Amino acid sequence: LDGGHRAVGAGRCHSPASGGGAEEEGMAPPICWSVEVRGLSQSSSFIICSLQGIVKDMKSLTPHLLLCSFFTSIAPALGEGFRNKRVAFIPTAAAHEEYTAYVDSARSSWKELGSNITDVDIARMPLRTATEALEQAEIIYLSGGNSFYLLDCLRSTEIDQIIRGRLAEGAILVGESAGAIVCSPNIAYIQPMDRVPDNYSQADYTGLNLVDFFPVPHYLAPPFVKSSKEVVAQHASLPLELMNNAEAVIVEGPQRTKISSEHQ
């Protein structure tokens, strides 16, 4: 899956237009961030608003993972932990998609954060070169696209093991749409929303298993209104994490924080 609205074929979606009303006298419209924090023993929620769209309270968060539907909608709220960093940008999931504007959108958002970006196409780049780029990166970004193709590439190249090692060393993983889905224990659940390529080479759909929940990006967002409901209906027994195109989940050890941005 990729981050957005329009569909070109089954299991694909495309970048949403930025939400909100017209700007007035050069001032950005107010942005409300709804934040739900869930830990092992407590649950709380609160609302933070910022005219500039920068949530100061979020700047203290340095997560292991950030999983989202559409990175560009979340990027304005990210604090110093995401700014001026070396980013290994993995666009591989979108390699065979007809519409890839969401990849360019994410790349632009990273540049606005002052990132030093290195493109790492794990399906085409020599393994040694890709490994070196990942070892130097402070943040590893997995783009949207086809979840099954991305997982196949990650596992067949054993880049999944390299990513796991980098996270243990303190790197941050950001997964957008398909990039979020592959972090789950097993991605079979997402088939109503995404297609399995004919040349998928793995024996199963075991994911990276970096989180103990199952992200459902683009929940109730066109063109996935019906298919996202099907995922929920078919897998109600799983700990699903529903995210619309303005939501993300930040994972810090046993605690996960869900944030939501909406132009008001």
Residue ranges and their predicted role:
Residues 215-246:
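Conserved anion/nucleotide-ligand pocket segment
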Residues 58-139, 143:
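N-terminal beta1-alpha1 cap of cysteine-dependent amidohydrolase-like domains
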Residues 239-264:
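A contiguous loop/helix-start segment that scaffolds small-molecule binding in enzyme catalytic cores
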